[in-house]
Amino acid sequence: MKTIGYAIVGTGYFGAELGRIMKEQEGAKIVAVYDPENAETVAKELGCDVETDLDKLCSRDDVDAVLVASPNYLHKEPVLTAARHKKHVFCEKPIALCYADCDEMVRACKENGVIFMAGHVMNFFRAVRHTKQLIAQGKIG
């Protein structure tokens, strides 16, 4: 199985948690993070590099996909940068705060032939995973 290299933009609660979950997944490796406030702390926990420039982050050969978990109003730039560098994108919700930005982001990913996924999923939350385990064990549901 090929290992997919991920970079995380925004290492607050959601970005750090996505990193922790991805670190546990077979075939996935967090290779770098970008965040002006707490990248160092999260990078140390995840065992990855810190990048201080989006273009450098997205131009890395070991990055296949970019997870965008920055504050909502900061989603556009990393999505467009990742698409320009031909990196697949997972973007936390809401992907944009206005239709024009959303349209531009989706269009950029299409034009560059990369997958763009909005993070409308909950299976990364510990409570949801724990509930799934309890159901599988027959303890609930």
Regions inferred by a protein language model and the residue ranges of each:
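N-terminal Rossmann-like dinucleotide-binding module
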Residues: 1-46
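Conserved G/P- and acidic residue-centered "switch" motifs that form tight phosphate/ATP-binding loops
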Residues: 10, 93, 138
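Alpha-helical structural signal in soluble globular domains
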Residues: 21, 25, 42-45, 81-85, ...
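Acidic-histidine catalytic/liganding microenvironments
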Residues: 25, 60-61, 125
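Short, well-ordered coil/turn segments that N-cap beta-strands
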Residues: 28, 64, 87, 114-115
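Local beta-strand N-terminus motif with an aromatic residue
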Residues: 30, 63-66, 140
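Beta-loop-alpha module in the N-terminal Rossmann-like domain of NAD(P)-dependent dehydrogenases
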Residues: 48-108
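A contiguous active-site-proximal alpha/beta segment in oxidoreductase catalytic domains
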Residues: 96-141
